[in-house]
Amino acid sequence: MCAAEVDRHVSQRYLIKRRLGKGAYGIVWKAMDRRTGEVVAIKKIFDAFRDQTDAQRTFREIMLLREFGGHPNIIRLLDVIPAKNDRDIYLVFESMDTDLNAVIQKGRLLEDIHKRCIFYQLLRATKFIHSGRVIHRDQKPANVLLDAACRVKLCDFGLARSLSDFPEGPGGQALTEYVATRWYRAPEVLLSSRWYTPGVDMWSLGCILGEMLRGQPLFPGTSTFHQLELILETIPLPSMEELQGLGSDYSALILQNLGSRPRQTLDALLPPDTPPEALDLLKRLLAFAPDKRLSAEQALQHPYVQRFHCPDREWTRGSDVRLPVHEGDQLSAPEYRNRLYQMILERRRNSRSPREEDLGVVASRAELRASQRQSLKPGVLPQVLAETPARKRGPKPQNGHGHDPEHVEVRRQSSDPLYQLPPPGSGERPPGATGEPPSAPSGVKTHVRAVAPSLTSQAAAQAANQPLIRSDPARGGGPRAVGARRVPSRLPREAPEPRPGRRMFGISVSQGAQGAARAALGGYSQAYGTVCRSALGRLPLLPGPRA
């Protein structure tokens, strides 16, 4: 690792272990928090505010992760650290072992139970997002992270949009641009429909399910026209009413040219041993008309994931998500950066631990306590990820029907970062932001303090905070870590780490599934790289924090 790649104030806080991947727009490292011993993934985004598009995407992703990060199937953003050059930015995430794209590419590593388990967790995350009237718009295997216990974390919210900020039309909300990966785009997106609904995510989930069942993408189109061609050769042709409902100006002309081509059935694309309930769910998700696709809540009740279904653990938000800056307000890149840095400085002054009451989810305290006591059943560990010790078998929770299926349960972890993102629904926003603030739970006060918006003053404040310690006059003037619990100053003893014999991680390996969209839009990938099977077996288990 080149020392110049990591700013000094970042390396003082996190011990960089190794680089997981590098692309044109960023680097991802595996690291360890020097204070807590927690293993994390640090993503450095190059020129995160190079233009209005990238600045808005960075701002949007951080704000949405703030809203959704309390869900067990959505990646947790632990820390946001501005770079010294005032252009790059560091995002610190919880560490995951691999992504679904890498696992599928290895071939025959997932048993039927693993596929059901993974898809159930994806549906659970999607239901939570949609309950806040947000659509992800970029669900694909590379954005589905996995760990050794087969736990799923949905990531990369840079293209997500809040439907609350857009006018509603006859078929949904009006969105102006869409640049997600082509292979997972819904027909209404390919046909430039003027109205989008949560159905675009359900189509993407259908494509992900089909790819897990088939072992390769269902519709690997090389162009928009070819993508439509592959889709309409497989699913039932739409009716005239369904075409008119899309609100597309030229959908009828395109479909007229494609409707006479030879056809094939969806089950012909899948292996002969595909479970009948999997095929049925796939057909219900890959319906041409968005309003005829299953919703996430309906799909959770489908027989394919019935053994995991437990309504008390399938959370919903109590209110819509509204970003601090209205989606319709186009700020300049420096304005997005200033707003974000103001919020970082404000959070550092008011660092506090998140409370369960602030999560903005409909879940009882008893269910939350039960979720902390249980973990994923060890019988569903995929062989490719079996690098951690097996967990003890816990009691199986009962569902509302009285029988005892296997359930997915993810233990919530705690962390004390210097910059603790506020809990969802805290209602806080930067000074001067337009639009409505997020709805706050009853009894939760919002705090908005004025911060000088100039970059000079912010840089000075940042430089003063770079050592990540401050003096505490009340405790005798000694240094203390802001927002962190006190732990012994001695670092956890590191286990010897074997040097890899070959290149283990590479962003380019999964480029086929990502398509050329990333290069075209000038964005960045949040994939954590591709992991080979032998490399996973050599990954050392880092010790946790000492008592």
Curated annotation (Swiss-Prot):
Phosphotyrosine: modified positions: 178
EC class name: transferase
Mutation effect (residue 176 to A): Loss of autophosphorylation and activity. Loss of autophosphorylation and activity
Domain Protein kinase: 14-305
Post-translational modification as stated in the protein's UniProt record: Autophosphorylated on Thr-176 and Tyr-178; activates the enzyme.
Region feature Disordered, mapped onto this chain: 370-503
Residues with Omega-N-methylarginine modification: 449
Protein name: Mitogen-activated protein kinase 15
Species this protein is from: Rattus norvegicus (Rat)
